[in-house]
């Protein structure tokens, strides 16, 4: 009998495979090429472009178990995770999809057959909902499937004046594909509170939605018109954790096998005997989302996806401390997760070391401030009037101790308190932006430039090719046109082309389209679905069905492909030198340089860069022949071919192999042999985000030019220091050492002169209420000499108050000194701050010694004149 979570997952995929569905592996939690989404949060996300008509697949039926995260933007379930039966940051969404193939009746039949046939659920335990006006779905459920009419609930719009705003009507955005949906609910029994969907008690836990079937049959226009789609599609989703709970005869998702194992392992690690403690649930959930996010290349940071990951990690750590965890514990749970999910997701075991390392680093960083932050929070709570923590206090906890606002909200919730979220947002406004992206597709998809054409790429073996113009667009309004007139900018789509369209980091080709009477100058080439769009300017009239000779800029292409092939070598060299955790995070290969972004959590040392560069150049000298072949993607991955971040691949892929050194999935254009690159020179290495490094490099003549520039600079430096090139570095080191020594000697002399000047100042003391007081403007004496001067003066005066000022350019330096017998009457910090405020600054320090700065030297005289009156009052 199907029971375990792993069995349910496999049974679902196997069932739909028998219904001619292609099993599609879960895509990354980081949506490829989709800036509108923070994370993959639904099973249909990888197929979004297919539903929109911007991408085609080799299949029209698909099924998947998609990893999802909901912990940011609109879908932020974080504060509820652990406290309810079904909220998670990470979950798996089972789905079956039809891209213009089967529709409503088959989708309903398949769902019912799987639930009642394969899983054996009792039919009387199930009820369904349909959109109020969807008679087709209602009739099929009743007449063909046999669901009693009283078990089919019609769900209408949420309000009369908001048509199609319903729990049973799904939209991709304000415009674009949409349609009614039908949901299947499971009745957990009368002993659990709650009513059926549509009833006043629908938010109870008795009736739980387990499957949603979306019928994409309309295209909503900007004026609200609903046009029927020519090829209606199906998008379904069933939460694996929810259906597993039913199969294991438990009510809460946290009671299923995967979570129980994680909870028990966490309890054992933390010596917690209460297996029902909600903090164990929180930690069990969070180790899943954190581990899978790191697998997909997300690293903790202070913005975007990395900040969401950091929030989840810190929430887990805080709940560990609630359970009196000692030491670092969270990273130790990765092994437990692998034991539960490693078979379905082998990438967990493959990246275990990097997951554990990143979690431990984050634990260490947060652990240093957690206890101090909790002390501050307890102090805030002790002085709280009312039940709302002020936004400024929430911000202070965030800014000083790294407490995300939702972590503070979590703690407040446990004590029946709330936070002033609006006040926190105001305080955050001038701070670093955090990614709070909406998870709906908020674009008008009907306005996106689209083409239904298919361009055959001939550029692997041809620099020029004869072709026919099959589509034209005007650049100004991006409308399809029948002709581009001479002088107009636009887009030309051909049936065949040698022009490479920008993809995988390789820029698009430029060149000319030759026509009778003139040319179309191509400045860039991009993809529009399966069409290659040649962007540029017409220098003659270009009409549909015209024949052209498409000719790329050969010299530019040659420079681009050198950088592209070198990028493959660089990627592999980095993995060999730094470790297998290195993955591509982005790249650019143009005619001038290559830029490669990769995952690595610390700076690359000079020696490591040297080793990488030397390894790449060794492979260039080995002059490997480029080999390309097409194969199924799973076969390619089995051979060790690397798939690149953010790229989408068809079932059949092109594999580029460079000797025994590099093998990658790649549709780009390359040199024939690695020796064609010439050599590679790394120009720079830097960090561009937390956990992401960037290397820029040049190849071929670009590398030669760079070396020549470096050599010329070195020759100039050698001449300046009167040395030859060979000994220039030693001579420069000697000069730097001598310069530092001279600076040190000059500093000592200045301090001695200042001390002497200070001794002379003793004669300028005055008395205020029987206390010796010295107030002086020292002109341009260096600020760092002031402290020693004050110590010397205090020793000579034995009892007294000192206030000194100095100015160097626009910078003001202030220092106040008070002998210990007088600090009960005058505080040096108060004195220096009073003066500093008058010269555009502020400062503070100990009661006996305090320093400050300022930016208004013109006010020094008047500020010092105010000291006597201030001291007269203090010393009264």
UniProtKB/Swiss-Prot annotation:
The keyword Nucleotide-binding applies. It is found in: Cytoplasm. CDD domains: AlaRS_core (cd00673). GO terms for cellular component: cytosol. Its cofactor is Zn(2+). It catalyses: tRNA(Ala) + L-alanine + ATP = L-alanyl-tRNA(Ala) + AMP + diphosphate. Its EC number is 6.1.1.7. GO terms for molecular function: alanine-tRNA ligase activity; aminoacyl-tRNA deacylase activity; ATP binding; tRNA binding; zinc ion binding. HAMAP family: Ala_tRNA_synth_B. This is Alanine--tRNA ligase. The gene is alaS.
């Amino acid at each position: 009998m199907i029971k375990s979570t792993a069995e349910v997952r496999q049974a679902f995929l196997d069932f739909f495979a028998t219904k001619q569905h292609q099993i599609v592996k879960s895509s990354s939690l980081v949506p490829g090429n989709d800036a509108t989404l923070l994370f993959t949060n639904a099973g249909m996300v990888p197929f979004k472009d297919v539903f929109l008509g911007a991408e085609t697949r080799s299949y029209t039926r698909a099924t998947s178990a998609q990893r999802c995260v909901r912990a940011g933007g609109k879908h932020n379930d974080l504060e509820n995770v652990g406290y309810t039966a079904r909220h998670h940051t990470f979950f798996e969404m089972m789905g079956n999809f039809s891209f213009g193939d089967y529709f409503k009746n088959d989708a309903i039949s398949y769902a019912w057959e799987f639930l009642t046939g394969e899983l054996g659920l009792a039919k009387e335990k199930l009820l369904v909902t349909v959109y109020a006006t969807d008679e087709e779905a209602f009739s099929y459920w009743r007449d063909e499937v046999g669901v009693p009419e009283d078990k089919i609930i019609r769900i209408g719009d949420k309000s009369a004046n908001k048509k199609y705003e319903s729990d049973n009507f799904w939209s991709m955005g304000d415009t674009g594909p949409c349609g009614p949906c039908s949901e299947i609910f499971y009745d957990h029994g009368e002993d659990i509170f709650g009513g059926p969907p549509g009833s006043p008690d629908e938010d109870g836990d008795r009736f739980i939605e387990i499957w949603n079937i979306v019928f994409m049959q309309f295209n909503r226009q900007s004026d609200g018109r609903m046009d029927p789609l020519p090829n209606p599609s199906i998008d379904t989703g069933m939460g694996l954790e929810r259906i597993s709970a039913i199969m294991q005869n438990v009510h809460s998702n946290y009671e299923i096998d995967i979570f129980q194992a994680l909870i028990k392992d966490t309890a054992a690690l933390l010596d917690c005997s209460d297996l029902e403690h909600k903090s164990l649930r929180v930690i069990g959930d969070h180790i899943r989302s954190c581990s899978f996010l790191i697998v997909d290349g997300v690293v903790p940071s202070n913005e975007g996806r990395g900040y969401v990951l950091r929030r989840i990690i810190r929430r887990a750590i805080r709940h560990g401390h609630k359970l009196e965890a000692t030491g670092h514990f969270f990273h130790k749970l990765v092994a437990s997760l692998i034991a539960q999910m490693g078979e379905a997701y082998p990438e967990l075991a493959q990246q275990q070391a990097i997951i554990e390392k990143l979690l431990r680093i984050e634990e260490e960083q947060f652990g240093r401030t957690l206890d101090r932050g909790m002390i501050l929070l307890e102090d805030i709570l002790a002085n709280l009037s009312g039940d709302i923590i002020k936004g400024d206090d929430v911000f202070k906890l965030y800014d000083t101790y790294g407490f995300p606002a939702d972590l503070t909200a979590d703690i407040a919730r446990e004590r029946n308190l709330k936070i002033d979220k609006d006040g926190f947002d105001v305080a955050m406004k001038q701070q670093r932006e955090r990614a709070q992206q909406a998870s709906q597709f908020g674009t008008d998809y009907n306005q996106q430039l689209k083409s239904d054409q298919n361009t055959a790429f001939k550029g692997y073996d041809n620099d020029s090719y004869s072709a026919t113009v099959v589509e034209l667009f005007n650049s100004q309004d991006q409308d399809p046109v029948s002709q581009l007139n001479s002088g107009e900018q636009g887009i030309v789509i051909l049936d065949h082309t040698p022009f490479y369209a920008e993809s995988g980091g390789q820029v698009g080709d430029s060149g000319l389209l030759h026509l009778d009477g003139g040319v179309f100058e191509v400045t860039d080439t991009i993809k529009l679905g399966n069409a290659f769009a040649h962007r540029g300017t017409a220098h003659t009239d270009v009409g549909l069905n015209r024949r052209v000779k498409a000719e790329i800029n050969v010299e530019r292409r040659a420079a681009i492909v050198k950088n592209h092939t070198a990028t493959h070598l660089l990627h592999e060299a980095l993995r060999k030198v730094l470790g297998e955790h290195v993955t591509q995070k982005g790249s650019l290969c143009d005619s001038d340089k290559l830029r490669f972004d990769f995952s690595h959590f610390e700076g690359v040392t000079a020696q490591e860069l040297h080793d990488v560069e030397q390894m790449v150049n060794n492979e260039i000298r080995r002059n490997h022949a480029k080999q390309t072949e097409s194969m199924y993607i799973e076969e390619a991955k089995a051979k060790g071919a690397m798939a690149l971040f953010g790229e989408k691949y068809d079932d059949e892929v092109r594999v580029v192999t460079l000797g025994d050194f590099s093998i990658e999935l790649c549709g780009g254009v390359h040199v024939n042999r690695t020796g064609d690159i010439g050599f590679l020179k790394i120009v720079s290495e830097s960090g561009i985000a937390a956990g992401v490094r960037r290397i820029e490099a040049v190849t071929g003549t670009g590398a030669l030019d760079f070396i020549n520039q470096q050599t010329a600079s070195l020759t100039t430096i050698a001449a300046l220091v009167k040395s030859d090139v060979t000994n220039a570095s030693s001579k420069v080191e000697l000069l730097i050492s001598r310069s530092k020594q001279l600076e040190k000697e000059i500093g000592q002399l200045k301090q001695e002169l200042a001390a002497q000047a200070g001794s002379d100042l003793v004669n300028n003391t005055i008395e205020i209420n029987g206390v010796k007081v010295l107030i002086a403007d020292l002109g341009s004496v260096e600020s760092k000499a002031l402290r020693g001067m004050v110590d010397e003066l205090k020793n000579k005066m034995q009892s007294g108050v000192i206030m000194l000022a100095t100015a160097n350019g626009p910078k003001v330096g202030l220092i106040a000194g008070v002998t210990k017998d007088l600090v009960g009457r005058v505080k040096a910090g108060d004195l220096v701050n009073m003066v500093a405020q008058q010269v555009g600054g502020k400062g503070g320090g100990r009661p006996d010694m305090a320093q400050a700065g300022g930016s208004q030297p013109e006010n020094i005289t008047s500020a010092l004149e105010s000291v006597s009156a201030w001291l007269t009052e203090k010393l009264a």
